[in-house]
């Protein structure tokens, strides 16, 4: 990671994310400090990415790379530069509704697997796009395919509470409000995609149940 990205993350993005969210973090000790590793979090706002980058220690943030939709984050040269150079995204193509990766002939997870092979810590949002509020949506199986390809890589579930109120879906201006981040114990690949996804969903919902009440509600 270049010094520019490191300085912007530590000196700009981290203070901004902490100011906007308060970042009450539980279970920080479960965060992976080296890769290959996967962090799987719920997704209610674009603030989620900055918040997750903010809670990693400086010695590990160099390897943290969020998986993001190429068509959204690379649609504009300025946004694309910031997304790649500062946030450090791993851009992947999104399949159209009802389209399967196998049918399209495109290996959409190839960039993510390459990042894991390089020793990165991937941040993935299995719901895909930000949902509405703090309810967990349907999880896509891409994270299971990554875990299957790298069975020794830990998969750490994370529940983010309240980010959807800091920057609701469709809004452009954030509002400083308190959020909670709950980091669960890492999961290991057990050889079955369906079982893995069920375990991940159960882990995320268990973390959600432990989240404190929203202080501004």
How would you name each of these model-derived features?
Residues 33-98:
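Catalytic core of membrane glycerolipid acyltransferases/transacylases, capturing the structured
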